[in-house]
Amino acid sequence: MIQWIQYYWLLLVLKKYIRQHKLPVTIHSTFPMIQLHTNRNWLYFITITAPCKLSTTVNRIRRQHLHAKIILVAPNVNYSEIFEAHLELFGIVDTKQPLLMVMDELNEYLEYIFQPKLD
C-alpha cells in the first residue's frame, strides 16, 4: 500500500514540475515505473523495494534504452546489492529522509536532466 502511495506522490511531483517548466515531455506510468522522454532523453523513476525486482526492471530498461537515466526512489536502499549486481543507476533518492529533502533531490535531478545545454 505504501508503495502505491509513494508511486502516485512521485507521479504528481513529476507532473507538477513538467507543468511549471512547460517541458515537452511525454509521461508513461506503469507501476512501479514512471517513464519520461523527450527527443533526447529517456528518464525512468523506479519505486521498487525488492532487490530482485529492481535488478530485473533495470536490465529490462537497459535492453530497450541503453543510455536511459534510471533513478531509484525507495526507502531502505541496499547499496551493496546494487553495486554487486552492477546496476547502472543515474541516482538514488532515499525516501526515509524528510519530505523536503526528497523533493529537493528530485528537483535537482530534473533540473540537471532538463536544463538547457550551454555550449
Q: How should these model regions be labeled?
A:
Residues R19, I61-Q64, A85-L87:
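Short, surface-exposed basic-aromatic patches at helix termini and helix-loop junctions that form
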Residues W4-S29:
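Two-component/phosphorelay signaling modules centered on CheY-like receiver
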Residues A74-Y79, F83-D119:
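Output/docking surface of receiver
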Residues M1-I5, L72-N76:
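Short beta-strand/turn micro-motifs composed of small residues
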Residues Q20-P24, H67, L89:
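A generic structural signal for alpha->beta connector loops
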Residues M33-N39, E105, Y109:
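Short amphipathic alpha-helix with an adjacent loop that forms part of the alpha/beta core around
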Residues L11, L36-I70, N76-S80:
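Conserved phosphotransfer microenvironments
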